[in-house]
């Protein structure tokens, strides 16, 4: 098996300008409007659980509410990423969440994110209402 190299120029462009890569709808319960480009996927044969993704959130799109069984790193490449705890992250912000953290990510205005998970996440039901962020007028 030969090693693969994927090269994406100027990844800090808006995901909606990144037309040189293939985006797929991320269709899972609780996810609305999120698109992804898989950089690498888990490989059970190699004992590898990690996944690397580019995520594209159009305005008002959101992921599911979930708990992390490993670490998750999110680098906002463009736009505004909104966390269910009410904090918003912007282009250049790096967020690292540890095992046991729970959240639902969304975007009120649209964003592109590099996401790396060391282990899978598990869907959960939130124990308190999720704080929604509304777009600025």
What role is predicted for each listed range?
Residues 1-48, 130-137:
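A short, N-terminal "cap"/entry segment at the start of jelly-roll beta-barrel domains
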């Amino acid at each position: 098996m030969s090693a693969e190299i994927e090269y994406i120029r100027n990844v800090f462009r808006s995901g909606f300008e990144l037309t040189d890569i293939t985006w797929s709808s991320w269709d899972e319960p609780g996810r609305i409007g999120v698109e992804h480009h898989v950089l690498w996927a888990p490989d059970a044969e190699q004992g590898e659980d990690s996944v690397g993704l580019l995520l594209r959130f159009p305005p008002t799109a959101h992921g599911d509410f979930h708990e992390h069984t490993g670490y998750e790193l999110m680098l906002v490449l463009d736009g505004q990423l909104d966390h269910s705890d009410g904090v918003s992250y912007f282009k250049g912000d790096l967020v690292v969440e540890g095992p046991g953290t729970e959240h639902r990510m969304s975007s009120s205005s649209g964003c592109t994110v590099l996401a790396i998970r060391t282990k899978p996440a598990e869907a959960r039901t939130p124990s308190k209402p999720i704080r929604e962020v509304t777009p600025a007028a």
